[in-house]
Amino acid sequence: NLAKKYPNLIVDNSHSFFCKPLGLASFNSLRKFFNVQNGAYLFTSKQLEQVFDVDKIELQPVSMQENYEKFLKNELFLDSQKQIKAISPKVEKMMNDIDFEAESIKRVRIFKQYEKVLKNFNNIQLDLNSGDIPYCYPFSPNSEIIKRKLWSKNLVLLQLWKNFPKSFIESEFLNDTIALPLDNAEYAEKIIEIIN
């Protein structure tokens, strides 16, 4: 119904990389799902005649902490950019080397590992439907002890909605939610070990 009302509708699948395009214009995010620092895939039924400049951001793979810091800096940089660019050749090669089937299986497996251990400590009750490939495991700890344990270990803990305005009813929930990544089995084991 929205597509009928708004003919120029664009679907933001930045947290749904594996979601199939539904005929509407949509985009997803490479860097939110994979260890690359730039790029997205744009899907549209229209043929684009324009040739886009190539993105020149080239960051080397580093530690998770350094990568997260570079991710945040890159986020600010991308917010200042107002044009579409083609992804860099380096990122394109990295994406071509990814086994997407194996990646999706790994994400579901790690999600289920988190859910098995964390569900009793999570304010969010989750159901993963068949065919869903999640971006993260959203963890909203229901205990201050667990929160302190996690923060004391100096792990990179992503908060997607950090500092959400307190005037919104959702602020307490969103400010407390940690997006546990699903692309690193060793990281998941550390989180589970800390909480157990």
Where are these regions (language model features)?
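Catalytic PLP-binding core of fold-type I/II PLP enzymes
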Residues: N1-G23
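Active-site PLP attachment segment
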Residues: G23-S63
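Active-site C-terminal subdomain of aminotransferase-like
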Residues: Q47-V91
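Short, conserved charged micro-motifs
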Residues: Q50, N142-L150, E186-I191
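Conserved glycine-rich beta-strand-loop-beta hairpin in the small C-terminal domain of fold type I
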Residues: I87-E115, I124-S140
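Conserved PLP cofactor-binding pocket of PLP-dependent enzymes
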Residues: L128-F139, S143-I178
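PLP-dependent enzyme catalytic core of the Aspartate aminotransferase-like
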Residues: K166-N196
